[in-house]
Amino acid sequence: MKYLVIGLGNLGRAIAKDLTRVGNEVIGVDMDLHRVDMLKNDIAGAVALDSTDKEALSTLPLSEMDAIIVTFGKDFGTSVQTVALLKSLDAGKLIVRAISSIHETVIRAIGVSEIITPEKDFSTMYTSQASLGGLFRHWYKVTDTEHLYKIGRAHV
């Protein structure tokens, strides 16, 4: 599959590398040339451009992408502008990181249905793991939830 990751901070960089590692074609985009340079040899392509510039965004192969992932973690305005421009360019499937509940509300209002909330998701998962009393130290590797439930119930 083909992905465009916009915003190459910690989350965007990790997503781009992981998607590439499992066989996907990934193009990364960030305005920061240093971030682009750090990633350019690890993924199919990396481009330095301003994602709030409609003309610049329109130079990207948006229609060829299976999904476009917007991962800005600090700048609410840049995220909203980028998403609005992508929608106006009929960019296709968008997956967007929300940094607050109001950010999530605004992005949903623009028409995005797939939203990433890494801080909230981690908190939920860690709370679940902590409530098991350390029974599973590597909770993120557990995939068989049916047996996890049975084990948890057996120790109650």
What positions do the PLM features span?
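Cytosolic regulatory regions of ion transport systems
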Residues: 1-155
